[in-house]
Amino acid sequence: MRAYVITIGNEILKGRTINTNAAHIGRVLTYAGYDVIRMVVVPDEIDEIVWAFRDGLSRADLIVSTGGLGPTFDDKTVEALAKALNLELELNQEAFSMVKSKYDRLGVELTKERIKMAYMPKGAKPLPNPVGTAPGVYIEYAGKRILTLPGVPAEMEAILDEALPQLRVPGRYYYEESVVVRGIMESALAPVVNEVMRLNAGLVYVKSHPKGIEIDKPVVEVEVSASGSSEEEVRGRVKEAIRQLVSRAKSINPQCC
Amino acid sequence: MRAYVITIGNEILKGRTINTNAAHIGRVLTYAGYDVIRMVVVPDEIDEIVWAFRDGLSRADLIVSTGGLGPTFDDKTVEALAKALNLELELNQEAFSMVKSKYDRLGVELTKERIKMAYMPKGAKPLPNPVGTAPGVYIEYAGKRILTLPGVPAEMEAILDEALPQLRVPGRYYYEESVVVRGIMESALAPVVNEVMRLNAGLVYVKSHPKGIEIDKPVVEVEVSASGSSEEEVRGRVKEAIRQLVSRAKSINPQCC
């Protein structure tokens, strides 16, 4: 199952905000059994957001977006989502109750900016926001699932946590382990990485992440990961590959790891 | 001038690594006068990287990528770049000298993994890497500029710093300032934001970033920014819009800011 992550917001494009949301979602979905195949960041513009949802729908089984769900003029995600799906935008009664109850508690009136957060594409299901006000949006379309979340990290995380049990890919497990290799240049470790990949072709993925300075002070973190239908099996494959890697790296530099 | 940012690496898609590179590049390019219009993250797969470069070329004047320049099997960026541009991949003599001199210093041989880092599309210019080994790649194609940088942040930043003077958009300035508004819900501030946008239509951009809890403890950071051909003018526009915003916000809650 393939997942696609969309981040909406000019502040990300301008580098004003680091996109920790995409990383969080990527992590959660990977461990939920998905292959995250693409992430995109688009501005607060309808046509760009529409493009992102359509690109996601053409490539993945699950699309998760963050940002653009609030009460301001540049919160355009649900409008764009409706357009991307050719669905009508309507006042969702369940979402309206959620939004209303939040403001009722404070005794403030429901202005059009507040009611805006209860509009959703026809057929969408609002997801309660335990932290903030704007509900998340869940919709199924052409066999694909779309989850639209707020951009505030605490709100995004809370709604995603709630939705996760339904999103998890049944019988699909991911496992990952890393080993830090010191005193071997990444270029010298490359043939070892290649060999371990060959020995476990299609079963594990090995990637080296240089953390030091290639020539003067080489430190390489090697990540080994696997996905499969048994938790025990993927863990076993990763551990065996790590063992192969460490034994070969030690033959280059016995103090490496 | 429009810029497009590509991040290459499975570790970003899996959320193992937070994409600080894209934020850094977005920030630097915004202040260099670009509109960053899209960011994408793609896996270490040729076809996906080719797609990203082509999507960038079809939309932007400058494309900056990070990741996939190293010595390992999954460093595929230059190969994909050559394919995206329909150019031959060749051993770049200038890049070869750069790579060779790094390893010569240590007296180690130039294995094929090390020489790999000197291959570039025909016509590309290598950019010296003062921190690591793999040179950056600069190439002009169909009136567009492409800058390909390593994924290690210190290396990426150093090469980008060096390249920046040539990339800067002449006579284009960006300025941004923020004000923190307390005790006014984002939904109550929305009409104020709208009004300030209307008063300065096309001149400034105003975006509210909720930082607290909408109903119980509202804290909203309002960002005002402008781009234009005079540094003084954009600064003046932003400061005037901030003044309008603060005066209107204070009429809702005098202690707000």
Curated annotation (Swiss-Prot), chains A, B:
Hey, which family's this protein in? Belongs to the CinA family.
Q: Which Pfam families does the UniProt record give?
A: MoCF_biosynth
Instruction: State the organism named in the record.
Output: Caldivirga maquilingensis (strain ATCC 700844 / DSM 13496 / JCM 10307 / IC-167)
Classification via InterPro entries: CinA (IPR050101), CinA_Arc (IPR023055), MoaB/Mog-like_dom_sf (IPR036425), MoaB/Mog_dom (IPR001453)
Report what the protein is called.
Answer: Protein Cmaq_1209
Cite the CDD domains for this sequence: cinA (cd00885)
